[in-house]
Amino acid sequence: MNFFKYQANGNDFVITEKQDIDVEMVCDRHFGIGADGVIIVEIIENRCVCNYYNADGSYANFCGNGLCCVADWLMKQQMSNHCLIQMGDKEYEAYYEEENIVIKVHVPELLGHNLYRLGVMHKVADEELQTDEYNLNFAEILNRDTLRIQTFEKGVGWTLSCGSGSMVSFYHYYIHNEVNRKVMCISEGGISHVWIEDLYLYYAVTAEEVFVGVMN
């Protein structure tokens, strides 16, 4: 069965319709394909349902960059510029805007001090922390329109970019009136944009198909 290697700002994934795979082996960069995660997709009555797994094999209810990659894969197959994708327990809207994929996501739920849930749990760290309970985001405000972000992802480690981490970091600083309603997020892997309209966040990034292969 074919698999598709994708990346969005260096956050890379294997997309496949194969259901029974060893996620850890597939993600291993020395003995497998190499990726931050695996996204298993299923087309059910013209609906796209996908589940995301971290590199260590653990399940995650949401992955922003992963969702953008699936959206690009799906819209190219459907020859469309708009789609709906179920990831985990929610359905998301995605569309092309010039060279970017844009996804629409409900604003995060505030759980505690700097701690949010956006499908998965993220903390905007104001100090150096070590935890395996949630994703950690280290953000620097360069100006009211620009953030620099690094994310340590639960089940993966340091990644070149994290879509949900960028969205949560933006939202955290936006509700504290430290950034404007639309920002550019700079990560080690590249640039994305996040903005807010009513109760929804919009995340825009370029997703790229790196190569296609066959999985035994």
Give the predicted meaning of each segment.
Residues 1-98, 116, 122-216:
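A glycine-rich beta-to-alpha transition motif near the start of alpha/beta enzyme domains, typified by
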Residues 101:
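Active-site donor-binding segments of glycosyltransferases and PAPS-dependent sulfotransferases
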Residues 104-112, 132:
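Active-site glycine-rich loop that binds ribose-phosphate moieties when present
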